[in-house]
Amino acid sequence: MFKKTTIAALTATALLPLAQVQAAEYVIDSENQHAFIQFKISHLGYSYIIGTFDDFTGQFTYDPENLEAASVKINVDVNSLDTAHAERDKHILSDDFLAVGEYPEASFVSTGFEPSGEGQGKLTGDLTLHGVTQPITMQVEHIGGGEDPWGGYRQGFEGSTTLELADYDIDVSKFPPVMQELELYVVFEGVRQ
């Protein structure tokens, strides 16, 4: 009996590093410009305003053998908004819209992942923007992963969703309906820790 228990314990101990390799922690590589948070919103129905948030941090866990256990956490410096027009940025960041003085940070914390096909799925989570937290669902796709030229290991993903600005107490009622929602797009590489 002792021999069987010892063998089972040694086998479990030997397999533990393999499990740890699979369920890896990654830091999003926003510092080296391998990650982007972008948005697109209609301008009066005539064209689009496209912008980015340039300053953010985040991490995620990813196990290709247990996709349901994937998790993501991202923090965004709202003041890093950039639409390539300084006066417009100032207005968007003002109390008229994002009120960055009162709400300097936005965040996303995942609550679940549901695979839907080869490298694709639905990521659910809580998005906090303008001091309001709402559940969202984001369509995501695994772009790829592997070793990088610097001795690290990376995984890359992209995702998108649509947000109703009124859900975050951002008053856009004086604008046409086409300006009351925006498309959010994220793409990032994570470096395994």
Task: Describe the function of each predicted region.
Residues 1-22:
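Gram-negative bacterial Sec-dependent N-terminal signal peptides
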